[in-house]
Curated annotation (Swiss-Prot):
GO CC annotations on file: cytosol
Function recorded in the entry: Catalyzes the methylthiolation of an aspartic acid residue of ribosomal protein uS12.
Listed name of the protein: Ribosomal protein uS12 methylthiotransferase RimO
Binding site for [4Fe-4S] cluster 1: 14, 50, 84
Similarity annotation: Belongs to the methylthiotransferase family. RimO subfamily.
Alphabetized InterPro entries for the sequence: Elp3/MiaA/NifB-like_rSAM, Methylthiotransferase, Methylthiotransferase_CS, Methylthiotransferase_N, Methylthiotransferase_N_sf, NA-bd_OB-fold, Ribosomal_uS12_MeSTrfase_RimO, rSAM
Encoding gene, per UniProt annotation: rimO
Amino acid sequence: MPESRTVALVTLGCARNEVDSEELAGRLEADGWKLVDDAEEADVAVVNTCGFVEAAKKDSVDALLEANDLKGHGRTQAVVAVGCMAERYGKELADALPEADGVLGFDDYADISDRLQTILNGGIHAAHTPRDRRKLLPISPAERQEAGAAVALPGHGPTDLPEGVAPASGPRAPLRRRLDGSPVASVKLASGCDRRCSFCAIPSFRGSFISRRPSDVLNETRWLAEQGVKEIMLVSENNTSYGKDLGDIRLLESLLPNLAEVDGIERVRVSYLQPAEMRPGLIDVLTSTEKVAPYFDLSFQHSAPNVLRAMRRFGDTDRFLELLDTIRSKAPEAGVRSNFIVGFPGESEADLAELERFLNHARLDAIGVFGYSDEEGTEAATYGDKLDEDVVAERLARVSRLAEELVSQRADERVGATVRVLVESVDPAGEGDGVRGRAEHQAPETDGQVLLTSGAGLSVGRMVDAKVVGTEGVDLVAEPLLGSPEWSEEAGR
């Protein structure tokens, strides 16, 4: 019997890319490929790249070069680029980076197995010429669902399989194959974006906004629960737009309670919310539905009106603070995170001071700060009044220092509070990191963790109530409560 073909998936970038990698993994495994964790053990190393900002693109190139270094002295025979940077640059990337044996776009995903086999056999796959993927779907959202059947939409599940391939209880295989044993998994709610932020190129390569049907999201969530997942995080470029192409802009409000009722799911988290599209009903559902985390990942980006207008965005400091007041009037301990761009073209000292005023009053749990840099193909790249790089760097350092101080202060405010923690890692020796998890106000990777002072009887995937007794920067230190049903049940075994 011939030795099985092996493939490793290396994922960079956001949670949406993680979903796409698991779809690719499912397709490859269904076609006989053996998935391995270490690229050194793979015939083909597939690097799922990020093309968001310059630093992310550099990381993607570095990962491709690192994988290429494995060729010639191990099992690895080919390195293939997929993902956003591959889609965005296509042939340009292939010409600039001959170390990659193939550059595959989203349209290649349905045939990923054949593409990799061709490359592994020494064949050449001609990289695509990039196109604006917004033009693949109708301008009218109401017409997109029908047209979407003919468009590659990574993470939406395959549309190229015959009916009846998989049981009705779950998504049609091969939808995805989990690449780790984490009790947390992202679920793609939609793809693309209809907003026209002047600094962002994502819509050009991810396309116009298109929702997944609620039944598909529910089926995938049930399947994930069967795999041991306890928390799902809904991801897309803009979750607040969910349902607008399905005839119901409030569809998220009705979907969330249904997701929370899926057997085995203990927490539902929503990410990527646009402040300008927040509505009272959505705030109500996010703050009052059992098992739905009162968590708000709000994309503020700035708070000075002049800068926001130049960004083609809406709002100001006072309106954003009013939104936060509304949220906290319903859920005082709600978690809030956001990202900000400093050094945007035309940003004055007064604009920066206005952003700092907002940050000082907002009491955010997590803050990401980025220095502006031109992204080709964006409106902002054509702007005059650009700031010198050293000015951008100074402002980035200044606001980053403030952000670090503020999120530490916000963590201190939670001392004495009771938090519900999903256990994500347990050191069996009781040393090192001990038992770590996340509370409702903490999303994976970005928002800090909770270190539990006692781990007796706790295991990965358990929920436990704990009292916050201290902090380590943005992280919390908490003591499990003896009365927590899950802790007591597990500890007594």
